[in-house]
Amino acid sequence: ETDSDFYGAVIEDAIQQAHEMGASIQCMAVTDDISYDCKSTSSSAALDESIYNGGNCDRLVVVSAGNIETTEIDASDYIESCKANVIKSPAQAWNALTVGAYTEKTVVTDDRYKPLAAPGGISPMSRTSWSWRNGLNKPEIVMEGGNVANHPVLQTTTTPNLSLISTSADLAESLEPFYATSAATALAVRMAAKIKTVNPDLSLLSVRGMMVHSARWT
């Protein structure tokens, strides 16, 4: 396991290696275990510096906002859970495009459970910058990240019906459920790549700007 003091160096090296391989749009769906309440960390500083890249600004790094575990969700008022659980490092980086999760998924096949979030609402697993007071608003955009199923007695849980789907690392299973801000970040990277492919002359700053400023309120 990498010591947290070296997270910044690892991030810089990974972004540089990917850039040298031709990946100008990069996905970072991993965060620190700790939230630093928008304070700069070695991770976020390294991310900012790598994206700036000496003024070239020739990289777009899309970062997940971080997840709330289902055991930490207050089903009686999950919006307050989202407000109370702040974005994890390094997603507070100013130059990164930070992605949270919302959901349109509300179909549950198990009659004992009900979807917790209404269609178009923030995903119960998505963190926010609600408590920050430094003028930095994160995430900049949200994408589909799935919902959770709630039972008045049993534990709140994720279900395949309320999740997205992706290829599996398990060789015995070709597909598996995919949810929360990692899934949302993957969708955002896909969108960025499609915009850049159709408009190859656009700068990556323009791609980011188009994604943020063309977003609609959910």
Task: Please report, for each region that a protein language model flagged, where it lies by residue.
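Glycine-rich, charge-decorated loop segments at or immediately adjacent to ligand/cofactor-binding or catalytic sites
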Residues: I68-Q92
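Catalytic metal-binding/acid-base residues of hydrolase active sites
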Residues: T31-D33, G66-T70, Y102-K105, N147
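Catalytic-core regions built around general acid/base machinery
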Residues: S42-D58, N85-S89
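Extracellular S/T/G-rich loop segment that most often corresponds to the catalytic His/Ser-adjacent loop
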Residues: N85-V189
